[in-house]
Regions:
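PRPP-associated nucleotide enzymes
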Residues: 1-141
Length: 141
C-alpha cells in the first residue's frame, strides 16, 4: 500500500493555486458538463476547479455515505475490495464528465469511477490526477 501526503501541497497556497491552475488548463482541452471527484482527497482539488469553471460538482463517495438513491460499483484495491457510489440524479444522459482525483496508482478506483459515470448515462471526458505512481501502471490502463 502506497500513500502520498498531499497536505504539504495544499497547505502552501501558491503551490495549491498552481496545481488548480494546471488542472484547469488541462481540462480546457475537453468539453465538460460536470466535474466528478473520488472521495475524499479528490474533493479538495475538484471542488476548487468546479467553482472556478462554474461547473456542477459530483461526489463519488464510499458505500452508504450518500443520502439518496445511488448507483454502486465494487472494485479491487491493493488490500481488498471497496465500493463507490453516486446519486442516481447527479449525472444526466450524455453529460460529459471530467473525473479528478489526487492520485492514480493501479487505476482500479478510476475504472470504478468511469463505470459509475457510464451506468448513470454520462460519458467520461477525461481523467486528471495530481500524482501518478508510474510504477503501478494505473495511467496505462
Amino acid at each position: 500500500i502506497l500513500f502520498r501526503d498531499i497536505t504539504t501541497l495544499i497547505k502552501d497556497e501558491k503551490a495549491f493555486a498552481e496545481t488548480i491552475e494546471q488542472i484547469i488548463k488541462k481540462s480546457k482541452k475537453y468539453k465538460i458538463d460536470k466535474i466528478a471527484a473520488i472521495e475524499s482527497r479528490g474533493f479538495v482539488f475538484a471542488s476548487a476547479v468546479s467553482y472556478l469553471l462554474k461547473k456542477p460538482f459530483i461526489m463519488l463517495r464510499k458505500k452508504n455515505k450518500l443520502p439518496a438513491d445511488t448507483y454502486s460499483v465494487d472494485f479491487e484495491l491493493e488490500y481488498g475490495t471497496a465500493t463507490i457510489e453516486v446519486h442516481k440524479d447527479s449525472i444526466e444522459k450524455n453529460d460529459s464528465v471530467l473525473i479528478i482525483d489526487d492520485l492514480i496508482a493501479t487505476g482500479g478506483t478510476a475504472e470504478a469511477a468511469a463505470k459509475l459515470v457510464d451506468i448513470s448515462g454520462g460519458k467520461v471526458a477525461a481523467f486528471i490526477f495530481v500524482i501518478n505512481l508510474f510504477d503501478l501502471g494505473g495511467s496505462n490502463n
